[in-house]
Amino acid sequence: MVLFLKVVLVVLVVYLLKMLVLFVLFYREIKNICQKDPAAKNCWEVLFLYQGLHALISHRLAHFLYRCRLFFLARLISQISRFFTGIEIHPGAKIGRDFFIDHGMGVVIGETAVIGDNVLVYQGVTLGGTGLQKGKRHPTIGNNVVIGAGAKVLGNITIGDNSYIGANAVVIKDVPANSTVVGVPGRITRQDGRKIEVSLDHIHILDPIMQSIEELQVRIKKLEGK
C-alpha cells in the first residue's frame, strides 16, 4: 500500500511539473485564450481543461517532428491528439501565433493548410482539399480571421486578412481582405465596411456537390469509352 501511494505521488508530481513547463512554454497561447474566451475563468483552467490548447500544443510538437522528416512519429502524435481532443490537425499544417480553437470538436485542418496570426476557429470547421492532386491543395488563411462553426473552406484558396467566414458557409473561392462571407456556396456580403448586394436567384448559384457529381459522370464516360 505504501509503495502504491509513493508511485501515485511520483506520477502526480511528474504530471504537475510537466504542466508547469507547458504553462511557461505556451503562456502566450494561454493568455490569448483567456482574452478571447469570456468563459475562461483563469489561465490554469485553460491549461488543464481546454482541448483546443491541448491540440495546439500537440501540433507544435508534431509539426517540429514533421519538419525533421520524422513523419511516422509526427503522425502518431497527431492521431493520439485527435483521439483525446476530437480535433484533427495534420502535422504538416503551418499555424501562426495566437491561434485559438473554441470548443473544437470536429475541427479538421489539412496537410498543406497555412494559417496566419490571431485566427479564431470554432467547432466543426474544415480546412480541406478538393481533390487528389499533390502539392498545395488546402487553404491559406490570413491574419485576424474568424471562421464560424461548421464552415468549410476547401481547396488551394486564400482568405484575406481581417475576414469573417459565417457559420456553415462553404467557401471554394478566394476571399479578399476585410470581407464577410456567408452561405452555400460562400458569398461576400460585406467588404471594407461596405455592404455587398447579393443576388438571391438560386438558379445561377453553383452547387459544389452537383458539380462534383457531373465531373465524376464525365470521368466515367471517358473510362467507358476506352
Predicted regions and their residues:
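Low-complexity, compositionally biased segments
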Residues: 159, 164-168, 195, 204, ...
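Structural signal for interior beta-strand "rungs" in well-ordered beta-sheet cores
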Residues: 82-189
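Terminal amphipathic alpha-helical/low-complexity segments used for targeting or macromolecular assembly
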Residues: 1-81, 196-226
